[in-house]
Amino acid sequence: LEWLIYENKGLLMASKYDKIIEKVFFDNYSKTSKISFDREELALASKKLNIPRIKNLGDIVYSYRFRKDLPHTINETARTGCEWIIVGTGIGSYEFRLSQIAKIEPASNRQKIKIPDSTPEIVKMYAPANDEQALLTKVRYNRIIDLFMSMTCYSIQNHLRTTVNGIGQIEVDEIYLGINKNGIHFVFPCQAKSPGDKFGIVQVLQDISFCSSRYSSVICRPIAMQFLNDNSFAILETRIEEEDNILKLVVIDEKHYKLVNRDDLSHEEIKNYRKLSNDVT
């Protein structure tokens, strides 16, 4: 019974959020690719709709940025092949932006590259099997970012919450700094997802904005990672492209890795990796 009550409250709140965000969108709508609004408009919309004021107005925007799609009535106004997203433009200010429809997920036909597992046994014993924190931990201990980017990389911060001018509050799962053989410096903002989740453009946009603000002198290369199962995961390098004011999330590179015990990696497999490397070069 308690579960049903909780579920009904969640559905009711979702319905309120849909009505409020629809009101704000259509009150400002014009046939452009950018529509600005602020937090006070959310409060005004709830008042006009006779909806008791939501205590945490920011959760309305957060829901549509990271947890759910905007109502279909809003996306029906988008150009063919596009959808509306919400991006932060400052503290308490936002924009609806047109973006190509692109919820990215790992490819299903990639070779899994076996890597000897360097995760400490005590960490394996106590770390959860496949949540985002466990993924970040295994990637860090096995220096997967170094392998993927072919350079030396260092984790400097994880689960960072901060405020960026022109964006507002953001959270970055983990940040790596890297240096290549030519001495060029890079910053890699990482986002981790649990199995079944998809990568969206909003998170990548805010990661890039954060790095441009804090690490303006280095090259930013966003990374997405996701468990495929307990010991296999996908690593993707992403990029944002923009044409005619329409945003697009693209994948630059993708590799799948599998952590194994040393007995599970044969000499024949190692020879095959070498052959594949020679074929590529």
Which residues does each PLM region occupy?
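Nucleic-acid nuclease catalytic cores
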Residues: 193-198, 212-242
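Active-site metal-binding core of divalent-cation-utilizing nuclease and nuclease-like domains
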Residues: 149-181
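Charged low-complexity interaction tracts in eukaryotic proteins
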Residues: 6-8, 14-15, 20, 60-107
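Acidic-basic catalytic patches of nuclease active cores, encompassing PD-(D/E)XK
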Residues: 116-162
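Positively charged, polyanion-binding regions of nucleic-acid-associated proteins
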Residues: 8-39, 45-49
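Conserved catalytic cores of phosphodiester-cleaving nucleases, focusing on short active-site segments
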Residues: 139, 174-178, 185-195, 207
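Domain-level recognition of nuclease-like catalytic cores that cleave nucleotide substrates
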Residues: 225-281
